[in-house]
Amino acid sequence: MDRVLVASYPINHLIRPHSFRIDYCWSTCFTSRLNSGKERQKLSSRWRWRSMASDSTDSSSSSSFAPSVESDPSDKTSASFCIIEGPETVQDFAKMELQEIQENIRSHRNKIFLHMEEVRRLRIQQRIKNAELGISKEERENELPNFPSFIPFLPPLSSENLKLYYVTCYSLIAGIILFGGLLAPTLELKLGLGGTSYEDFIRSVHLPMQLSQVDPIVASFSGGAVGVISALMVVEVNNVKQQEHKRCKYCLGTGYLACARCSNTGALVLIEPVSTLNGEHQPLSLPKTERCQNCSGSGKVMCPTCLCTGMAMASEHDPRIDPFD
């Protein structure tokens, strides 16, 4: 199909019978070749992918149209080609040729690094704006999602507020034990309620006899509540540990490290030699500073381990990274 475009009529308007006869014979032979199903499928597949790749080519390539169609360079990879548009729309790419697969892999990997570079520059600009506005409190950036808490009325789970979960859990357990062991028996004695079903057991384990007045319903409620809260706390701790394992060990999930050139200050002190004239003592001038060129004044540089993602072992083969999760 691409040779039909190349073997078009000449640019001048003089149609010579000789050239017209050659073009007619060549097109007839080419049409006869299309009778085989295998050749037609191959050419149609090549034309489909070439038509998609032609949308992303520059306008400068129009001057050399004939050699650009014949050649198949890697810079003609489709810019709008998307294999996975969402969890429900996944295109069938099993029929693609080897060259097309390699070109699309190269193109998509380049797009990934371009997007990561955009995120890096946006974060640098964000830090610069915060420094210009005088925002001294620097919150730690965390790209990993927060796990919702199983305990009601508590904030999302993270490693920073894990102590709050411990305090809440122990407070609830202590309150339930005090209610079931001391408060409930006292109220039952004053109200004339309760029973002696646990009296023998309390006496055998040498506990205060006041505990024998506990109602079975209260005891069941207290024991069940303590077990449920303990199980929820175990789940919360496991979620925190899983979240910490997914973070990068070097940048702790922030995606950036402190700049070693400016010592995380964002500015460099210019050291100038001091010269004296006639042995006179003159006061030294104040040192001058300039913006660090390594970190652009932000005090942070990209983490080379996670490539600004904040995730440990950021790789396209990492089984923990699930785009549909």
UniProtKB/Swiss-Prot annotation:
Keyword Iron among record annotations: no
Extent of the CXXCXXXG motif repeats: 259-266, 303-310
One Gene Ontology CC term in the entry: chloroplast membrane
Chain positions covered by the region annotation CR-type-like: 226-317
Location within or outside the cell: Plastid, Chloroplast membrane
Domain of life: Eukaryota
Keywords, in A-Z order: Chloroplast, Membrane, Plastid, Repeat, Transit peptide, Transmembrane, Transmembrane helix
Gene Ontology BP annotations: positive regulation of carotenoid biosynthetic process
Region of interest: Disordered: 53-77
Repeat region (CXXCXGXG motif), residues: 248-255, 292-299
Targeting signal (transit peptide) range: 1-54
Biased composition (Low complexity): 53-71
Record's function text: Triggers accumulation of carotenoids, mainly beta-carotene, in fruit flesh.
PANTHER family attached to this UniProt entry: OS02G0651300 PROTEIN, PLASTID TRANSCRIPTIONALLY ACTIVE PROTEIN
Further comment: Its sequence is related to the DnaJ family but lacks the J domain. The CR-type-like region is similar to CR-type zinc-fingers.
Protein family membership: Belongs to the orange-like family.
Protein name, entry field: Protein ORANGE-ORANGE, chloroplastic
Source organism: Cucumis melo
